[in-house]
Amino acid sequence: TPATAREIARQIGIWTQEDSDKNIITGPAFEALSDEEAAKRVQSLKIMCRARPTDKQRLVQLLQSQDAVVAVTGDGTNDAPALKAAQVGLSMGDGTSVAKEASDITILDNSFSSIVQAVMWGRSLYRNIQRFLIFQLTINVVACAIVLIGSLIGMGSPLTITQMLWVNLIMDTFAAGALASLPPSWSVMRDRPRRSGEHGDFIISKSMAGNIFGTGIFFTIVLIAALLILQKDG
């Protein structure tokens, strides 16, 4: 019943005193809504009780139509349509074989805390990849810029082939190892989920691109100035 579902949600921290009837709906009431009405309602929903398999599947599809990344957990045969429709379907280790086949991941220890920990590790790894890309692309921007500018102003190539190989092979290898070994942090759980679909987030964000080109331009100016000074003194 809605009262039972509300009490369970309150005990696990989903339902709060600020929530109202707009945050809960039953399966029959959800089915009676048009697609336009349901699309507006799903953003505020916290509880859906007495839901049929088609109701769960429709909820997933409506969220996906709004560029949401949807994960669904379930252990029964009636959860299979929603598990298959979601971007990530998670079945319980003790669940039915139908649920496991429809899901992408099976939680062997049947613990929801494992989902949170897996998300934390995945987000931390994604952030480490972004850190490496900032380092790698900044170096490449600077290296290309000083070689190009050096040739244009008649200095020749400031970097030899050996130096370029050193930068791209030796330095990058150690940097990749260092950045990849950074431990996961729970702070990543405060980040908003990345968008998917046609308007999804690219791994290089606008702030990262600004950081790469801003830092690259700064170091290019410093290195060209140093080369000009050394050439003049020499």
Feature roles, as predicted:
Residues 1-7, 69-70:
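Substrate-recognition element of Asp-dependent hydrolases with the DxDx(T/V) motif
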Residues 12-72, 86, 91-234:
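Membrane-embedded transport module
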Residues 79:
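Conserved cytosolic catalytic loops of P-type ATPases
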Residues 83:
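Basic, alpha-helical nucleic-acid-binding regions used in initiation and control of genome expression
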